[in-house]
């Protein structure tokens, strides 16, 4: 876990960046970003590796920032030029436009993150067969009827493992009134939630308690709204102690409600302890490490993915040090590093198997916790 946590800690540093649009990218050949430039890197190209953001900015302290950090780290280590490109709007056309701009700037590889890129990747991979496309948190299903081609590598994560660790840790640490706030009921969010429930139930069994309650709700979207804020205010005021907030900006609503009511929150995807004071831990993905490993695979093979990644969806989890809890920044009072290490090792060696189902209508079986699934 040390290598994974190193990436998490490095990526948590805030980046002060200007948004970029059109064909003028922000440029970097190191781990800090400079102003846009037309100066070529040592490779002779203005852009070697491009990162196309989602509609958020590059300093979002979430997927964009951590994925970009991975691109920067890789390019810095290999004397390559990294640039990011921000779509002007939330549409497939805008995403494709920035991919076009990256190719025109000489990109050999284009990195994206998030299921919204499914359709644009499906089109771009055929349009640019010599460009390598690395898509994090994008599954084969997100590409619709189009299969990933040899120049496309899809990476998804075993969110259920990270969710399980978070739920187990929370109950072991003494929390009895828990909540799960999901955004849209997409597979990744569902796996986080179901893992959380399974982990909480496992800890309750070990402790021999049956008084653990979990409120569970999908907001239906990832935007911060008054509806979500009011819902979270209600939960905390009714006695909920900690909520696993899983859904991008909805975390802002959860944090505001937690602050107002003296509650706590569990972050998601990246270590959010530096963003929200209410966070006791975060269920994280090794975004930067994933980027580095996959791009190194392509670079070492003449800028072509090997069979390890080419034309397939690779699912990463604890065995690859790509999901977990950032224990160095966690605020547990009872749950220990030793307990975490033992649980993590059990997941890695297969002695602990976590259900990875993601049917929103089929809930995980539990024995020692009571789950209130709300609509």
Task: Label every model-predicted segment.
Residues 7, 25-26:
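Extreme N-terminal leader/targeting regions
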Residues 11-12:
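Repetitive helical segments and hydrophobic/amphipathic motifs
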Residues 16-19:
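C-terminal motif of bacterial Sec signal peptides marking the signal peptidase cleavage site
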Residues 21-23:
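Bacterial signal peptide processing site
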């Amino acid at each position: 876990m040390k290598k994974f946590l190193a990436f998490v800690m490095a990526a948590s540093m805030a980046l002060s960046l200007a948004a970029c649009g059109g064909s003028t990218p922000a440029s970097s050949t190191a781990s800090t970003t400079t102003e846009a430039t037309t100066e070529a890197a040592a490779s002779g190209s203005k852009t070697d590796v491009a990162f196309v953001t989602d509609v958020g900015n590059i300093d979002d302290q979430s997927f964009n920032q951590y994925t970009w950090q991975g691109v920067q780290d890789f390019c810095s280590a290999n004397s390559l030029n990294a640039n990011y490109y921000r779509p002007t709007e939330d549409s497939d056309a805008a995403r494709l436009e920035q991919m076009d701009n990256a190719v025109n700037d000489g990109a050999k590889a284009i990195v994206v993150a998030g299921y919204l890129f499914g359709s644009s990747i499906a089109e771009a991979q055929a349009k640019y067969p010599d460009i390598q496309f690395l898509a994090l948190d994008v599954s084969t299903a997100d590409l619709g009827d189009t299969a990933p081609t040899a120049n496309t590598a899809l990476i998804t994560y075993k969110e259920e493992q990270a969710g399980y660790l978070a739920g187990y840790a929370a109950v072991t640490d003494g929390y009895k009134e828990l909540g799960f706030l999901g955004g849209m009921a997409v597979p990744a969010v569902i796996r986080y939630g179901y893992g959380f429930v399974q982990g909480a139930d496992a800890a309750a069994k070990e402790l021999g308690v049956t008084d653990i309650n979990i409120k569970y709700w999908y907001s239906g979207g990832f935007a911060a709204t008054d509806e979500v804020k009011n819902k979270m205010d209600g939960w905390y005021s009714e006695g909920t102690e900690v909520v696993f907030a899983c859904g991008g900006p909805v975390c802002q609503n959860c944090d505001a409600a937690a602050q107002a009511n003296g509650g706590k929150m569990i972050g998601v995807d990246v270590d959010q302890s530096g963003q929200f004071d209410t966070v006791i831990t975060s269920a994280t993905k090794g975004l930067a490490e994933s980027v580095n490993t996959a791009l190194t695979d392509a670079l070492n093979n003449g800028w072509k993915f090997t069979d390890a990644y080419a034309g397939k969806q690779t699912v990463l989890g604890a065995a690859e040090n790509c999901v977990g809890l950032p224990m160095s920044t966690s605020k547990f009072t009872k749950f220990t590093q030793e307990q975490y290490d033992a649980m993590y090792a059990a997941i890695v060696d297969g002695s602990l198997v976590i259900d990875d189902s993601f049917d929103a209508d089929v809930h995980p079986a539990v024995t020692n916790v009571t789950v209130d699934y709300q609509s």
